């Protein structure tokens, strides 16, 4: 049950003389909003993972020439899923390899917040993600350098300048905890 209601709703209805049948078609009811019920019961985000690969287990040719591994129907389903989600997260490798937009291309589509895990702030300022950040909410999660890891003051100045430039483009640069030098997704 939702902690804001904490099971009191049924009691209120009964007190008002309304017949209440609980657990009637429970599985069917729960399937109407799996995202909400997942969050209420686990307090963790509902995650949908999109992954494409060829029959031989590859995601692209060796030259990187293959643009589409999935068909048109799969790409449309991705757009419908994106429309329903609050955020879409990719690693910096995807941004560097594909320069994606990560938006919804449906005529009446809400674009989710774009989240890029980029521990070392390698995202190019001229990437489609950065260039459209004022149009689509964008967060770049990065790991701030620890004092012991900074080789010289120029390195830290560069990072601070990069954060400023990202923010000028409309990107929210979010310093986060690290796990083995990578963005810690559990925090």
Residue ranges and their predicted role:
Residues 3-9, 28-40, 67:
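Histidine/acidic-residue-rich, glycine-tolerant segments that coordinate divalent metal ions
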Residues 1-28, 113, 146-150:
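Zn2+-dependent cytidine deaminase-like catalytic core
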Residues 38-42, 46-55, 59-187:
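Active-site ligand-binding patch in enzyme domains
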Residues 10, 26-33, 75-82:
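Hydrophobic, well-ordered secondary-structure segments
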């Amino acid at each position: 049950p939702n902690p804001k209601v904490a099971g009191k709703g049924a009691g209120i209805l009964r007190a008002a003389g309304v017949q209440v049948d609980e657990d009637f078609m429970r599985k069917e009811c729960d399937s109407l909003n799996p995202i909400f019920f997942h969050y209420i019961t686990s307090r963790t985000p509902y995650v949908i993972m999109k992954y494409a690969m060829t029959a031989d287990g590859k995601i692209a040719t060796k030259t990187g020439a293959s643009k589409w591994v999935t068909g048109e129907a799969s790409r449309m389903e991705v757009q419908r899923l994106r429309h329903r989600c609050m955020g879409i997260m990719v690693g910096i490798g995807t941004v560097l390899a594909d320069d994606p937009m990560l938006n919804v291309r449906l005529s009446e589509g809400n674009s989710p917040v774009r989240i890029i895990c980029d521990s070392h702030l390698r995202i190019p300022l001229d990437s489609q993600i950065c260039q459209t950040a004022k149009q689509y909410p964008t967060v770049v999660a990065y790991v701030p350098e620890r004092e012991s890891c900074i080789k010289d003051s120029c390195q830290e100045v560069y990072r601070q300048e990069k954060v400023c430039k990202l923010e000028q483009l409309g990107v929210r640069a979010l310093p986060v905890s690290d796990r083995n030098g990578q963005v810690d997704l559990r925090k």
